[in-house]
Amino acid sequence: DHLDYHGNLASYEKAKKRILMAKQKISYETDPYKLFEWITESKPKKIKFNNLPYRYEIISSNVVNDSKSTNYHSLSHALKKAKHSFKKSKYSLIVCGDPKKEGYRNIKVDGPEKIYMFGSYAKNINKCIEHPKKIIVNSLDDALNQIYENTRPNNILFSPGYPSGNDFKNYSERGKYFNLKLGKYLSKWK
């Protein structure tokens, strides 16, 4: 304990105040990697953090899986990020899920060239989203096929914008399903 070492509170305070007296800077360096190298005389290993699965996960240079997007706010955030991810080029948005859990909120979507809607709630989503080019498809396969056949470049943002509803158990299952279906198209797009 500190008081055992210093004997009493006055000695403890005196020792701590001495730290402030020695405030001459020995380095103006603030980069933690350079400081580590300076102190340990070895180079630190750079740590790379990967995105968590299905949270704006970059699958390839032209595909983003944001299955975790389960509400208006996360969809809006993904749309803002997509402008930079796709370097301001055209992209398609794929949405699905149950808009009831978002209160059938009307959403004006800016950014994507086309919006593809699939699943048992596609017609309800169609009523909620304002965009000039909305396309209801029967399945995720149909959406991916239409994007592959009719859209160049094949940039895709999968950001459902709604909770899974009855179509999927949760966002994780939905994200895995997207990656599985996407697999057969990725080799064609390269």
Residue ranges and their predicted role:
Residues 11-13, 105-111, 171-178:
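Charged helix-capping and loop-helix junction motifs
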Residues 160-188:
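Glycine/aspartate-rich loop-and-adjacent alpha/beta segment that forms the canonical ThDP
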Residues 1-28, 164-172:
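Flexible active-site lid/hinge loop adjacent to a nucleotide/diphosphate
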Residues 12, 66, 93, 115, ...:
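Residue-level signal for inorganic ion chemistry
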Residues 5, 74-75, 103-105, 126-128, ...:
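Short glycine-/acidic-enriched loop or helix-start segments at secondary-structure transitions
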Residues 99-155, 190:
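C-terminal helical cap/extension that packs against the catalytic core
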Residues 1, 70, 98-100, 121, ...:
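Short glycine-rich anion-binding loops that position phosphate/pyrophosphate groups of nucleotides
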Residues 31-114:
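Nucleotide phosphate-binding/pyrophosphate-handling subdomain across enzymes
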